[in-house]
Amino acid sequence: MTQIIDGKALAAKLQGQLAEKTAKLKEETALVPGLVVILVGDNPASQVYVRNKERSALAAGSRSEVVRVPETITQEELLDLIAKYNQDPAWHGILVQLPLPKHIDEEAVLLAIDPEKDVDGFHPLNMGRLWSGHPVMIPSTPAGIMEMFHEYGIDLEGKNAVVIGRSNIVGKPMAQLLLAKNATVTLTHSRTHNLAKVAAKADILVVAIGRAKFVTADFVKPGAVVIDVGMNRDENGKLCGDVDYEAVAPLASHITPVPGGVGPMTITMLMEQTYQAALRTLDRK
C-alpha cells in the first residue's frame, strides 16, 4: 500500500522543535535568529512565498523583516541594500526572492550575499562546500527532501536514485546529497534520451522539471519512492505537481502530494538554516 509522505505534518512537527530550540537559545544567550527577505517588485507568486516565510519565521520564534522594493530599483541600489544587511549582526539570514527583473544580474546579486548569511545556499562558495562534501548552507528544498527520507525511514544506501531536473536550486544539490548517502545517482533533464526508460530503473525518483504531470506511470517502477518538487497549474487551474499523481501513486511505495508535500518542508528548512547561522555567530565570538 502506498504511503503518502505528509510534508505539511512533518514541517509542523519540525517547526515545533525549532521553536523550542529558538526559545532555549534566546533564554541562554539572548540571541534571536533573524531572517531578512528582500522582495523586488510585486510578482504575485513571490508575494505568496514571502508571506509564507514570514508566518514560518514567526511560528519558529525567529525575527523576520520583509524589505519590499520597487521593480525599478537599480542593480547598484539592490547591492547596496544587501551590503547593509551583510554588515548588520542582528540579521543571520539574507534571502533575495527570485526571480528578479531582467535588468538585474541574478548572479551578481547572489554573489553579493555574505556566504555565512546565504540561507538559500545559492552562493558559489556554499555550492562548492556542498560538492566537496563539507556543506554549511544547503538549498532548502533538497534539504527538506533529505529530512523526509530520514523521518520516513527510507534507506538510500546502494539505491538507484534518478533526479529529473538539473537546476542549481534543486536538481544538482539533490544529486550531491543523495550521493553523500551512498545512493547511485543519475542526474537527468529534458534532453535526456529515453527519459522514461531511465527513470523506470529508479528506486528513488525526484522530479523537479517544472512541467505539469510530466511523469506518468511508465516512468515509475513498482515500489519506487517518488518525490514531486513541481508546483504547477493544470488545464483547469488546479495546483498540481510534475508527477501525474493519480496514475503514479498506486505504483509507488511512498509519494509526496502537491500541495502538502515538499513545499512546506522547504520553508521549514529555511528557518532551520537561519537558526544554524545564528548559532555559528556564537562560535565566532
UniProtKB/Swiss-Prot annotation:
InterPro entries: Aminoacid_DH-like_N_sf, NAD(P)-bd_dom_sf, THF_DH/CycHdrlase, THF_DH/CycHdrlase_cat_dom, THF_DH/CycHdrlase_CS, THF_DH/CycHdrlase_NAD-bd_dom. GO terms for cellular component: cytosol. SUPFAM superfamilies: Aminoacid dehydrogenase-like, N-terminal domain, NAD(P)-binding Rossmann-fold domains. The keyword Amino-acid biosynthesis applies. GO terms for biological process: L-histidine biosynthetic process; methionine biosynthetic process; purine nucleotide biosynthetic process; tetrahydrofolate interconversion. Keywords: Amino-acid biosynthesis, Histidine biosynthesis, Hydrolase, Methionine biosynthesis, Multifunctional enzyme, NADP, One-carbon metabolism, Oxidoreductase, Purine biosynthesis. NADP(+) binds at residues 165-167, 190. One of its GO terms (molecular function) is methylenetetrahydrofolate dehydrogenase (NADP+) activity. It comes from the Bacteria. Belongs to the tetrahydrofolate dehydrogenase/cyclohydrolase family. Catalyzes the oxidation of 5,10-methylenetetrahydrofolate to 5,10-methenyltetrahydrofolate and then the hydrolysis of 5,10-methenyltetrahydrofolate to 10-formyltetrahydrofolate. PANTHER family: C-1-TETRAHYDROFOLATE SYNTHASE, CYTOPLASMIC, C-1-TETRAHYDROFOLATE SYNTHASE, CYTOPLASMIC-RELATED. This is Bifunctional protein FolD. The lineage of its organism: Bacteria, Bacillati, Bacillota, Bacilli, Lactobacillales.
